[in-house]
Amino acid sequence: MLTLRAPAKINLFLLITGRNESGFHLLDSVFCFTHDLYDEIIIVPTSATENSVKFIGASQAIGADNSVSRVLRFVNDYAKRYFNVTLVKNLPVAAGIGGGSADAAALLRYFGGLHNISEVLLSQVALSVGFDTLACLYSHPCHVTGMGEKIVALPESKLVYPILLVCPNFPVSSAEVYKNFRERRSIFSAESNLAGDHQAFEDMLSLPNDLTDAAIEIAPVISDVLKSIKNCKGNKVTKLCGSGPTCIGVFDTVENLRDAHSELIRHHKWWVKIAHISL
């Protein structure tokens, strides 16, 4: 038996810079990953000729054709091996923090090492699972452009940043948010011009998330979450993470961060967590 960790994905900003010939949106974002907030994946090989996948603690129902099952089917074809997988969902489902992508990426990392699968093939499988999965496969601070396939690693400092994550118990489809963005906006953002250089944490956070209005239109509760975080003492930055509905809060002191955590838990039935990232 083996247990893997699949950390949450955090977008410090998310710019939509255009669309490609196939109509897919092009993004410009920096991804970071939480040190202390993750799904847990328990893997047990089986002599059976089929996989079993069990989810524990999922905030929403997860269909049979999910990111974990897709990776397992790839491993079945590649290595002719089957597994019983139990996934402890500490991250909310369809929440904009890459839970499904992170789960798939953690499995790909493990099976890639176990069966000496080439990096090129792993990358192809990751992109076939989801646009965030490739960045989650590396699970290191990175500048992501294109459809998620262009990744430049950022030098990770020893600085650790505490953040507040708040998710209303309301799943949001990334596809629906991008569709809504396409229907309501025709002007795209300029690229951030990071070019892989290390930038200050605050500078990156000052850049917007272009999906915010589109996400709020689908899930108005996001606006309530953003306002609630912003109204907490010592709040410096409040923004949507990914396509939502999870929102990020950054505070001037750890004490104010902890107070905000306690206050939001006391007044709302939301998923509220303190996590730490490096950049």
Swiss-Prot record:
Binding of ATP, residues: P92, V93, A94, A95, G96, I97, G98, G99, G100, S101, A102
Pathway: Isoprenoid biosynthesis; isopentenyl diphosphate biosynthesis via DXP pathway; isopentenyl diphosphate from 1-deoxy-D-xylulose 5-phosphate: step 3/6
Keywords: ATP-binding, Isoprene biosynthesis, Kinase, Nucleotide-binding, Transferase
InterPro entries attached to this UniProt entry: GHMP_kinase_C_dom (IPR013750), GHMP_kinase_C_sf (IPR036554), GHMP_kinase_N_dom (IPR006204), IspE (IPR004424), Ribosomal_Su5_D2-typ_SF (IPR020568), Ribsml_uS5_D2-typ_fold_subgr (IPR014721)
Annotated Pfam families: GHMP_kinases_C, GHMP_kinases_N
Keyword ATP-binding appears in the UniProt entry: yes
Coiled-coil parts of chain: none
Catalytic-site annotation from UniProt: K9, D132
BP GO annotations: isopentenyl diphosphate biosynthetic process, methylerythritol 4-phosphate pathway; terpenoid biosynthetic process
Reactions that this protein is recorded to catalyse: 4-CDP-2-C-methyl-D-erythritol + ATP = 4-CDP-2-C-methyl-D-erythritol 2-phosphate + ADP + H(+)
Taxonomic superkingdom: Bacteria
EC number: 2.7.1.148
Recorded GO MF terms: 4-(cytidine 5'-diphospho)-2-C-methyl-D-erythritol kinase activity; ATP binding
Function comment: Catalyzes the phosphorylation of the position 2 hydroxy group of 4-diphosphocytidyl-2C-methyl-D-erythritol.
PANTHER family reported in the protein's UniProt record: 4-DIPHOSPHOCYTIDYL-2-C-METHYL-D-ERYTHRITOL KINASE, CHLOROPLASTIC (PTHR43527:SF2)
Annotated family: Belongs to the GHMP kinase family. IspE subfamily.
Alphabetical list of HAMAP family matching this protein: IspE (MF_00061)
Protein name in the entry: 4-diphosphocytidyl-2-C-methyl-D-erythritol kinase
Lineage of the organism: Bacteria, Pseudomonadati, Pseudomonadota, Alphaproteobacteria, Rickettsiales
Gene behind the chain: ispE
